């Protein structure tokens, strides 16, 4: 089966990694050229979920982990301060993980599929 994956963000790159060694012909498409391919949204996630995704693709999420949050300190405009306890929230090298998911995959940059 021929499969086209649109967009090399976290979801698209993860799908590419999962299908990489399958019997399918898989091509990824990223609208941005290679040199402008970036991750433009939040870099926070639920650690347990990304740990599971990485395990399914033979990766260790700890290799991409930047900060494993325990507490968030909040300061409001009116100088009100408070702390929020965190459970599982972390920041990670999102672009590094995306690029690792798609390494050695067939990805076409800067073109829309026809």
Feature annotation, model-predicted:
Residues 7, 42-47, 85, 93:
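Helix N-cap / beta->alpha transition motif
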Residues 55-59, 68-114:
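Conserved N-terminal helical subregion
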């Amino acid at each position: 089966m021929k499969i086209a994956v649109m967009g090399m963000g976290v979801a698209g790159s993860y799908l590419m990694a999962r299908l990489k060694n399958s019997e399918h012909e898989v091509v990824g498409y990223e609208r941005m050229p290679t040199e402008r391919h970036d991750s433009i949204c939040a870099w926070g996630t639920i650690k347990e979920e990304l740990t599971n995704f990485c395990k399914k693709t033979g990766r260790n999420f700890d290799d991409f982990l930047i900060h494993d949050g325990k507490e968030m300190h909040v300061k409001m405009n009116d100088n009100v301060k408070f702390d929020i306890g965190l459970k599982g929230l972390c920041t990670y090298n999102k672009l590094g993980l995306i690029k690792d998911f798609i390494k050695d995959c067939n990805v076409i940059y800067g073109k829309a599929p026809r």
